[in-house]
Regions:
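Interdomain boundary/hinge segments at the C-termini of tandem beta-sandwich modules
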Residues: 51-57
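Serine/threonine-rich, repeat-prone extracellular segments and beta-strand-based repeat modules
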Residues: 15-47, 51
Length: 318
């Protein structure tokens, strides 16, 4: 394992020489290895140097790895060498999310794709979605599910009858999810981001997402712009691989997630009633209407909903 690490020696006259025949100790590295010692002898002279190392043990079972290890693999762009789309890892959601309190909700996150749409969204990222419970795709719901409400912190896209401001300025993005937070380690209070485990938040990366960020009922290409997000909802195209109701220009900047491209079900179920299918919000504005956003139907198909109705949440992170 050291053949590419130690290849040259500095001679007495200051010249450098490519060498072979050196020895290394230990000969193989384990998780508890903290240093490597290299020795080289020539002309009766032996020189020894010790180099500190950090060894990370990586399991092919995603759930067996710490979030720090997953981040290290992600940074190296090697996630697909170890894990597969759809692999899961459990987390606990705990705290107040908008106007709803979650008390140690056990839920699994799963891999949507590796280096998804990297040229636009950022490279060396593993995209995850929240989540699954006992293998069932779920969305988080609140007590207002299926109803209109102006309550701040309800799981609505906005607190009034409008999609003005699009995804960027939505109540969902800022007040409920905290996706616009400057840092995952300093999340806005009472948001879903703040309710995620600290070890996960410590390694989360932002991504550049494209969406209609104007709204107002016009299918205008220039309305599709970028935002920097930590915990966004998926777009219509990221779910379905086709545009039905969203701004027709969104698809030019987006890609369908591999998990859904593979044919996996898009039907979400309520996190607190996993036998009941739920409508789930998308971040895409419904073009042609100034008061709707896209959503995934209880049959898994594309649909739309009034901005001030409460539906399920299933955001992603990176």
């Amino acid at each position: 394992p050291y053949t590419t690490l130690f290849r040259s020696a500095t001679m007495a006259d200051g010249s450098k020489k490519t060498v072979t025949g050196y020895t290394c100790s230990p000969t193989t590295m384990a998780a508890n290895t903290t240093a490597v010692t290299v020795s080289y002898s020539e002309g009766g002279v032996t020189k020894t140097t010790t180099t500190p190392v950090t060894v990370t043990s990586i399991s092919n079972t995603l759930a067996s790895n710490s979030w720090a290890t997953i981040r290290a693999v992600s940074d190296a762009g090697k996630g697909s060498n170890y894990w597969s789309v759809g692999d899961t890892k459990g987390i606990t959601i705990n705290g107040k999310v908008g106007a709803t309190t979650f008390s140690n909700l056990a839920i699994s996150v799963f891999i949507l794709g590796f280096n998804h749409n990297a040229s636009r969204e950022g490279s060396n990222r593993i995209h995850f979605q929240i989540g699954k419970i006992n293998g069932t795709l779920v969305g988080l719901v609140d007590g207002n599910y299926g109803n209109s409400t102006s309550t701040t912190g309800a799981f609505t896209m906005n607190t009034s009858y409008t999609n003005s401001g699009g995804w960027n300025n939505s109540h969902m993005r800022k007040t409920v999810l905290g996706s616009n937070s400057t840092s995952a380690t300093s999340p806005a209070a009472n948001t879903l981001l703040a309710a995620l485990p600290a070890d996960l938040r410590a390694v989360m990366k932002p991504a550049t997402k494209y969406s209609d960020n104007t709204g107002g009922g016009s299918d205008t290409a220039s309305y599709v712009t970028s935002t920097t997000d930590l915990l966004p909802l998926l777009s219509e195209f990221e779910y379905h691989g086709a545009r039905t109701y969203a701004n027709s220009a969104e698809k030019n900047y987006q890609a369908q997630y591999d998990y859904y491209k593979a044919g996996n079900s898009r039907v979400h179920y309520k996190h607190n009633a996993t036998g009941t299918a739920a409508y789930a919000w998308c971040r895409s504005v419904t073009s042609g209407y100034d008061y709707r956003f896209c959503r995934v139907g209880t049959d898994g198909g594309a649909g739309t909903g009034y901005a001030y109705f409460s539906w399920a949440l299933a955001p992603c992170f990176f």
